Amino acid sequence: MAQLLVIVKILPKGTEVDLDEMMEGLKGGLKGGIVLRRYAKEPLAFGLHFVKAEFILEDKEGQNDALEATVRSAKGVSEYEVLNMSRMSVDMK
């Protein structure tokens, strides 16, 4: 089965949220073959940062909805937005 690479933008509830702690909690809640590939903190405005994260998931029904539900239910998460989604090729690094 093919795999998808989903790049998302995750906004915290405020500047007091520890983004690394938020992502560790989110990573622990992932299931069903969804994997956090990597993430980076990016500045947004006025001291607020967001997380740009890459997830790998199977190309089957319900996976994207499961990812969104997991991210939105993680402690400290305010908003979730899909920036890009593409099918992974064999030589993708």
Curated annotation (Swiss-Prot):
Keyword set includes Protein biosynthesis: yes
Gene Ontology molecular function: translation elongation factor activity
Keywords, sorted A to Z: Elongation factor, Protein biosynthesis
Record bears the keyword Metal-binding: no
Transmembrane segments: none
Alphabetized InterPro entries for the sequence: eEF-1beta-like_sf, EF1B_bsu/dsu_GNE, Transl_elong_EF1B/ribsomal_bS6, Transl_elong_EF1B_B_arc
Gene3D superfamilies, A to Z: 3.30.70.60
Family from the record: Belongs to the EF-1-beta/EF-1-delta family.
Role summary: Promotes the exchange of GDP for GTP in EF-1-alpha/GDP, thus allowing the regeneration of EF-1-alpha/GTP that could then be used to form the ternary complex EF-1-alpha/GTP/AAtRNA.
Entry protein name: Elongation factor 1-beta
Organism: Cenarchaeum symbiosum (strain A)
